[in-house]
UniProtKB/Swiss-Prot annotation:
Response regulatory domain residues: 8-121
Keywords: Activator, DNA-binding, Phosphoprotein, Transcription, Transcription regulation, Two-component regulatory system
GO molecular function, one term: transcription cis-regulatory region binding
Positions carrying 4-aspartylphosphate: 57
Lineage of producing organism: Bacteria, Pseudomonadati, Pseudomonadota, Alphaproteobacteria, Rhodobacterales
Protein name as catalogued: Protein PetR
């Protein structure tokens, strides 16, 4: 019997260090985690992915977390937990009035965040948290639960290593992943061929092959982008 898919969390914080620490901590505790750097980035991720819960920093440059919360509440019922350096009662009330489900002042213990997330998820009706989780890549759609790529009702065949790469990139959509990290992740994925997954050059070859299947023009990648000097990033619609 297959186990249920882990809850998918969206972490939105403009502080790269905090964002990375929270992402690693929550992944270690059994969640699927996608990270956004600001409200605009979060909107792009929300347009192509389904989340069980959003952890949202209030104090961000540009559109702040309260404004984003108010807008999201007009479109979706996904639970929102706000993080902020301002812990006054008035600020907490403002956050809850905006539509947040909970409010956690900084600094906080990661364990408390974990407990609050689990408490919110226990309260949320199944109908709210359930649903298709997919990425849109132009005419293509990637199902996160099934790990399947399709165009309309036609499946797009992926090799074991291509499928492993898609799983890795989809779990970190919008985030740069370095070659070393990709090699390590592929090495842990038993479905990927050990020979295909080994080495920087082999990863580049597999990226090129995957682009041929997901890009309108593989020579000018729109979705699977190269971030010079850093690695690769999957940028869904």
């Amino acid at each position: 019997m297959m186990s249920a898919s882990p809850p998918h969390l969206l972490i939105v914080d403009d502080d790269e260090r905090i964002r990375g620490l929270l992402q690693k901590f929550l992944i270690r505790n059994g969640f699927l985690v996608t990270a956004g750097r600001d409200a605009a980035h979060a909107r792009r991720l929300l347009s192509g992915l389904e989340f069980n819960l959003i952890v949202l920093d209030v104090m961000m440059p540009g559109e702040d977390g309260l404004s984003l919360t108010r807008d999201l509440r007009t479109k979706m019922a996904t639970p929102i937990l706000l993080l902020t350096a301002r812990g006054e009662t008035r600020e907490r009330i403002e956050g809850l009035e905006a539509g947040a489900d909970d409010y956690l002042p900084k600094p906080f213990e990661p364990k408390e965040l974990l407990l609050r997330i689990n408490a919110i998820l226990r309260r949320v009706p199944e109908a709210v948290t359930a649903g298709p989780k997919y990425l849109s890549l132009g005419p293509l759609r990637y199902d996160l639960d099934r790990g399947e790529l399709s165009q309309g009702d036609q499946p797009v065949r992926l090799t074991a290593t291509e499928a492993a790469l898609m799983r890795i990139f989809a779990a970190h959509a919008g985030e740069v992943i370095g070659r070393t990290e990709l090699i390590e992740e592929l090495g842990r994925d038993r479905s990927a061929s050990a020979e295909e997954a080994a080495g920087d050059r082999a990863v580049d070859v597999q990226i090129t092959r995957l682009r041929r299947k997901i890009e309108p023009d593989p020579r000018e990648p729109r979705y699977l982008q190269t971030v010079r000097g850093l690695g690769y990033m999957l940028a869904p619609d």
